[in-house]
Amino acid sequence: QLIVLNYIIPKLHRDLKLLSLKKCTKSFVTETLRTIVQLAFEDQLKEDNLLVLTVDGHGEVIQFKGFDEIKTYLADFPLTISEENLQLIDRLKKMSREERWKYWMEEMSKCIKCYACRAACPLCYCSRCIVEVNCPQWVQPWSAPLTNMEWQINRVMHMAGRCIGCGACKQACPVGIPLHLMTQSMMEDIQGEFGVAPGAINPAGNVLSTFKAEDKENFIH
């Protein structure tokens, strides 16, 4: 059976047999392949449970033999932030701390806490999300600017060093909050402060889940 997916649905992670990327855009293909590599690194996918096919620019079918071959393919398509998003991030970073806080509070006032951003993300797969834990209550369940921001800070921290740059969080948001700017800004910060390129897989673990004595601390306020 041929299964065509926009993202690898978490419930299918362990049972998925065939993923076709036929007739998809280049960005779609690379985003999906990055998802596969990241999920495999996090032990959510096994090579013997997955067959990945795509079509090259000449219409020839490519069958990836394993995760290493996917990584080799992706080496020619490094994860980058679009010029438009870089300009938006730069505008945000040039704001004063107070201006930036006001901007995000205004955006968070629109949030209805539907968690579409979580549902759309190909790398949100926890069987029980932090927002569903009520003992202790990490994030308040009602919608209000401050608690909405608490939720997004948690989400972005969990995505740090893992985001594949697909922008699904922004696309899924029914009220148009530019959530992707948070994760993509984090990408920039991680590259600048830790020297880890966007989309890079660190065998030791994700950048914010590991510690090195030589890590810089001068940017922490």
Pin down the residues of each PLM region.
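Iron-sulfur-associated redox domains of electron-transfer enzymes in respiratory
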Residues: 1-109, 122
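Alpha-helix N-cap/helix-start capping motif
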Residues: 30-33, 115, 167
